[in-house]
Amino acid sequence: MLRNPISRAVVLAGACLVAITPFFWWGSPSGHDFEFHMFSWMEVLGQWKHGIAYPRWAALAHWGYGEARFLFYPPVSWTLGAALGAVLPWKVVPGAYCWIVLTLAGASMYRLARQWLPAPDALFAAVFYALNPYHLLIVYWRSAYAELLAAALLPLLLLCLLRLFLPESEPGFRPTLWLSFTLAAAWLTNAPAAVMIHYSAAGLTLILAAIQAAIGAEQDAAGLRSWSPQSWRHPVRTLVRTALAMLLGAGLASFYLLPAIYEQKWIDVSQVLSPGVRPQDNFLFRTIADPDHNRFNLLVSTVALAEIGALMFAIWFSRKKHVGTAAPGCPVARNATAVSADRACWMLLTAWGVSSAVLMLSVSNSLWQHLPKLRFMQIPFRWLLCMNVALAMLLPMAAKRWTTRLLTCALLLATLILAGRRFQPPWWDMASDIRQMSNAIADGTGYEGSDEYVPAADDAYELDKSLPLVVGGTGALPRIQILVWGPAEKRFTVRATAPQNLTVRLFNYPAWAVVVNGKPTATQKTDVTGLIVIPIGAGDNDIHIHFRRTIDRLIGNVVSLISLVLLVVVWMRARREAFRPANPEGSGV
């Protein structure tokens, strides 16, 4: 039973399908970020139909005034959502997205767990991780779809790091390349999760290096120290390779990352840390002067407390278990030349889980305020993503009896359901609600945008929804003819009886270039709202506005291309070296 990979994949996919069955009866859960993602997916699909493969400007945000949403928000989630919208009715896209992403998360956990656990235990870990309470909370209360997708990368992160630690699992430089690819995927999926993943990678690498140093000291004491391609890697080498993977990963993601970093000065990025979404406002059981915030915080805090309790149980009862002996022939079992090495996986999982739990508590506030960029994770309970990797792996090690495992799962699920009913029931959008959203995109009405993507010093709350696309100045009204009004290009003609300024229904973002009668023209902007103001002369004026390719985007594309070529070259070289006879005198790169 369940002895072949296909049957296990069917079980995992089926379990994830069961988890979203409420979608079939009640519609789509309309969590905190539901409209943000749905409108993004719909607009991306619309821009694809205009021939824009990689959108940068969300033209329909702020009711048609636009924002640079797709320049700053990582592309993987909105690409997947738009692709699903291209082949499925919009009313079923959220459910399909959640099912695919939960299944991917479970598959990545199975890939990790199978290295140390028998197939039945690995399948349990995969299903538990895919459907852990925090993932379900994201699906039904938060609709943080990009964050949910990032959860699929966390087991792969640990797997890549352990491959650096266990040279026989995959020789050569390929583990470093796999790690760089995972880190690049993190940047392209969700920025707060990418910060969390990089901090996790750094911390886990330091622990691995310490374990390697302890193994080396133990080998010295026993007279067994022998550094070779088949021995434990030197701690410094592990640190260097992780650093190289981080650099290469950032290089691969530079086509998104460099413009997002460089053009932050053109928006008010401080809005992402406004009151209510700051770390200090979102520690477990924290209350502020916002009843809605407090109810949701109580819900997520209750779920987190239950999961922390389960983690402590799993850590305590798995402390004497040898990970490698659970699955004969796995890398740990083959390479466990010392007790420290045999328990490396357990130590990493324990440290990762405990540190994740601590970072959700207010006692860690000084870390959030002083560690570079950590505060841009916004909400500390995002560390539940990492904590659940540890819990999913440690629980089958601690509880060998299926009754204990199922009881633990039942208690956690009951906690989520009861806390949800008591503190904050989920909201639901029916097919008619999603149809209204789709109509707002189709007819050009647009939607409410996000404050953090509005050009700096501009006030989106003062916008006039009834403003025409182009408005003339004082005096005689000019004759205006719209020729093109697309997401990345606007073109119109104006016949004016006197020189005047035109106001365009468009934020004056620096990437917009304006050409009047074939000549580049410097623009101004309106007070308060910051709309584009174009000076024109009397007579006929042909005006062309286009979203230009800035130098930072060009450099980002070049860096990504160079990084990709480097990755392919090094991968091919490592692949050739893997088939060469080992040199007993060498030490590997």
Write out the residue ranges for each language-model feature.
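Contiguous hydrophobic segments
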Residues: 146, 272-277, 288, 444-478, ...
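A generic short-segment signal for beta-strand/edge and adjacent turn/coil regions
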Residues: 9, 48-49, 128-130, 353-357, ...
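Cytoplasmic C-terminal tails of single-pass
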Residues: 580-589
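Membrane-embedded transmembrane-helix bundle of lipid-linked glycan/lipid transferases
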Residues: 1-223, 227-322, 333-428, 541-546, ...
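Positively charged N-terminal leader segments that act as targeting/secretion signals
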Residues: 325-327
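Active-site-proximal, structured, solvent-exposed surfaces of multi-pass membrane proteins
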Residues: 466-577
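Extracytoplasmic
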Residues: 107, 399-400, 408-499, 503-509, ...
